Amino acid sequence: MRVLNRLLQRLVILGLGIFSVWLIVFVVFDTAAQRLPWILAEGLTYGNAAYLILPRVIRMGLKLLHRKRVPSFTTTGDGLPGDPVNVALVGTLAQLRAAFAALGWSEADRLGLASSWGMIRAFVFNSPYPTAPFSTLYLFGRGQDVGFQKAIDNSPRKRHHIRFWSLSLVRAEETWAGGSANFWLNTDRPPDDERVLWVGAGTRDTGLSLTHLTFQVTHATDSDTNVERDFIIAELENIGSIEAVKVYQAGQCLATERVNHYTTDGRVTLASLVVDGR
């Protein structure tokens, strides 16, 4: 029965793929090509395919596959896999900010029209923008609470960066008893002055690229996120901002004071912030 269900799921996914190709090529492009110059028709087709059709088709496919396991990655606004979760720090928001400020990292601006335009200009002209905004990724049902970055060679095209989502230590302990899914589906953001678990996703941007599934314009990212995780932790260790550093393998229970359990499908480095956040 399970084999039959998987076969049916894959047939439906195949059907969605064929349908999306037909829609893009024979409906969107053919219609646009009849009414617009070729270059405009190509641009319109790309925009519809990358930002409207493919994200929705992929999201439907993910729902059909019942991706209900505890994620080891964040998700984009379209529900696609984003950056992997690879860091967990315990402390207050002030401590988190102080630790990364001591490294010379800058806190990212909130994403908006002004900051997005500033990022576009900086990217095109390769001019410094140390507080450039991040695209929004989702974990615990919300976008990142805070993010930090450090430009490489003073370029906005290449940078170390990490997003963080806060989770109350008390809330984490309570939700675990009800099952691992509840841990990740929790959407409550704790107060800024509370000592919390900061779940982070750190990656290194290497230039300009297109997303693999929808071909949207984005930063190219180094595929080896373990290197970036280890780099961030080593930097924090070198300045004495963290202690009790441990690396947890997939499926292991992670304990830190009031948090009894924390599981992941990938390796997550856990540490406690000890920097003075005042």
Report the location of each language-model feature.
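N-terminal alpha-helical membrane-insertion module
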Residues: M1-K68
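Active-site-adjacent core segments of small-molecule enzymes
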Residues: A32-P37, V57, V70-T76, L80, ...
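Terminal, regulation- and interaction-focused segments at domain boundaries
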Residues: H66, P71-A98
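Membrane-proximal, solvent-exposed terminal domains/tails of membrane-associated proteins
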Residues: P81-G82, V87-V90, K150-R278
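Amphipathic alpha-helical segments
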Residues: G91-L111
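Membrane-embedded segments
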Residues: W105-F134, L139-F140
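Functional cores of ribonucleases/endoribonucleases
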Residues: A132-S155, H161
